[in-house]
């Protein structure tokens, strides 16, 4: 009986194939890993975690996690959608200092092409700020993020959020309210994608 169980396991492994997991085109179609499956359709919907460092071959950026979701399998390649990113807890702890203020915001924004994204920007001040300054900086963060999302498509906005251009835009304006030490987009998460466009109704036949 034991031999039969072992043989069934071996047969199961033999029936599976390897699939490369590919990042989206705007993330350079980097291969972020591989997995085995007997039925490739079972891979669809699976979340994959990687880092910006692995996507760009820059190990200094391994403190930024990127979440991808498999959306299709073509041949031996599993393609993915970007679902968001998050800075590691250790990295956030490393930039928190005493006698300073940490200012967090949590905002749902809509991109020009209809994606709903939850964005969590964070500012770190040089010294402790007053409550009125904290409120003003938080409002400015929210306004900058919402405005940029409304102007950009999904791919552009997510690249700016993950690679630091959005946080730099916040820093340039918010530092005039109170001196800032650092600004980060701590997390993004795709909440909803636009519905597929309905196909045009056929024109009525000529009488």
Curated annotation (Swiss-Prot):
Gene Ontology terms for molecular function: structural constituent of ribosome
InterPro entries referenced in this protein's UniProt entry, alphabetically: Ribosomal_eS1 (IPR001593), Ribosomal_eS1_arc (IPR030838), Ribosomal_eS1_CS (IPR018281)
Domain of life: Archaea
Pfam family, one: Ribosomal_S3Ae
One BP annotation, GO: translation
GO CC list: ribonucleoprotein complex; ribosome
Keywords annotated in UniProt: Ribonucleoprotein, Ribosomal protein
Family membership: Belongs to the eukaryotic ribosomal protein eS1 family.
Name of the protein described by the UniProt record: Small ribosomal subunit protein eS1
Species classification: Archaea, Methanobacteriati, Methanobacteriota, Stenosarchaea group, Methanomicrobia
């Amino acid at each position: 009986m034991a031999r039969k169980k072992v043989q069934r396991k071996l047969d199961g492994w033999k029936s599976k194939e390897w699939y490369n997991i590919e990042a989206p085109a705007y993330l350079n179609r980097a291969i972020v890993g591989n997995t085995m499956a007997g039925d490739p359709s079972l891979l669809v919907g699976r979340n994959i975690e990687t880092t910006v460092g692995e996507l760009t071959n820059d190990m200094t950026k391994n403190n930024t996690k990127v979440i991808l979701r498999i959306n299709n399998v073509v041949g031996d390649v599993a393609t993915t959608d970007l679902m968001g990113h998050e800075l590691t807890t250790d990295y956030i702890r490393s930039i928190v200092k005493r006698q300073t203020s940490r200012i967090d915001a949590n905002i749902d924004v809509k991109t020009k092409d209809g994606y709903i994204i939850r964005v969590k920007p964070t500012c770190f001040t040089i010294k402790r700020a007053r409550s009125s300054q904290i409120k003003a900086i938080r409002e400015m963060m929210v306004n900058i993020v919402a405005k940029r999302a409304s102007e950009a498509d999904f791919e552009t906005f997510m690249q700016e959020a993950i690679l630091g251009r959005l946080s730099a835009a916040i820093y340039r304006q918010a530092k005039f309210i109170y001196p800032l030490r650092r600004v980060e987009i701590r997390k993004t998460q795709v909440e909803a994608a636009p519905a597929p466009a309905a196909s045009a109704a056929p024109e009525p036949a000529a009488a």
